[in-house]
Design a protein with these regions (language model features):
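Canonical tetratricopeptide repeat
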Residues: 59, 93-94, 128, 165, ...
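Conserved structural position within tetratricopeptide repeats
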Residues: 45-49, 78-83, 113-117, 148-154, ...
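Short coil turns that delineate tetratricopeptide repeat
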Residues: 51-52, 85-86, 120, 154-157, ...
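Register position in tetratricopeptide repeats
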Residues: 33-34, 66-69, 101-102, 135-136, ...
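Terminal, low-structured helical/coil segments at or just beyond the last alpha-helical repeat
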Residues: 192, 196-250
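Helix-start (N-cap) detector for alpha-helical repeat units in TPR-like alpha-solenoids
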Residues: 21-22, 54-55, 88-90, 123-124, ...
Length: 250
């Protein structure tokens, strides 16, 4: 009789702890949705003190990233991976992004490879690996990953940035025509979504257009730049007919 009561009491404590953890995780999720990241971290901590949970550890890491607690975020992503090592693609991806951000490129590549092994259709992971490959000078591999990401993503709020990153990889291969085409797609994407086109964006597009003998296109792109920058370009590119009119327009 006493043994049965003891078992029931223990079971009740376990259930209560699980319910409390779930409540804390739910509060953490709500705080995350409202952008209250430090509050979310507190709730996740309370829940994780009672039980391990992949999603809670992952979200805690993301919240810590948001408030620039990078070392703590890395530990949380590691906890998430430990809680679900065979199904942790997002934890591997975020830890890879963190490694890339902090300059730990080799470890970032290992993690993003694991993320893509578990989820081959993760567009953000494909994009990250493409950027890493570009940084390492493996331009063909970068383009392959970015091609896959673009094919999966289609037209969306991030597709333009995939074109931009692929343009950088094409530049590494000295394929300036493909780079020009991607850069044009990127700027078209920015304008379509009412996003700012920077001086650097126009400069890069103009350089690529000039590299493939599209002087008129380069002229149009560079006209959006400040007068001082246009003067520098005019001195660099020489005295072709188009550039003569470009200088006259300054």
């Amino acid at each position: 009789m006493y043994k049965q009561i003891f078992v029931i009491l223990i079971f009740g404590c376990v259930v209560a702890a699980g319910c409390n953890s779930t409540r804390m995780f739910s509060r953490g999720d709500k705080s995350m949705q409202n952008g209250r990241y430090e509050e979310a971290i507190t709730y996740y901590d309370k829940g994780l003190n009672r039980s391990d949970n992949y999603e809670a550890s992952l979200n805690k890491g993301i919240a810590q990233w948001k408030v620039r607690e990078y070392s703590n975020a890395e530990n949380s992503f590691a906890d998430a991976i430990k809680a679900s090592p065979e199904n942790a693609p997002l934890a591997y991806y975020y830890r890879a992004e963190l490694g890339f951000k902090t300059g730990n490129i080799d470890e970032a590549l290992k993690d993003v490879n694991k993320a893509l092994y578990q989820d081959p259709l993760n567009v953000q992971a494909l994009n990250l690996r493409g950027r890493i490959c570009t940084l390492q000078g493996r331009y063909a591999a970068a383009i392959e990953d970015l091609n896959a990401a673009i094919a999966i993503e289609g037209e969306s709020r991030i597709s333009g940035y995939l074109y931009h990153n692929r343009a950088i990889a094409y530049i590494g291969k000295d394929d300036f025509k493909s780079a020009r085409d991607d850069c044009e797609l990127f700027i078209r994407f920015l304008r379509k979504n009412n996003l700012p086109v920077t001086v650097e964006d126009n400069y890069l597009l103009g350089v690529l257009q000039y590299a493939v003998d599209d002087e008129d296109g380069a002229l149009t792109s560079w006209q959006h730049m400040p007068t001082e920058e246009k003067a520098k370009i005019g001195r660099i590119v020489g005295n072709s007919n188009s550039m003569y009119h470009f200088k006259e327009a300054q």
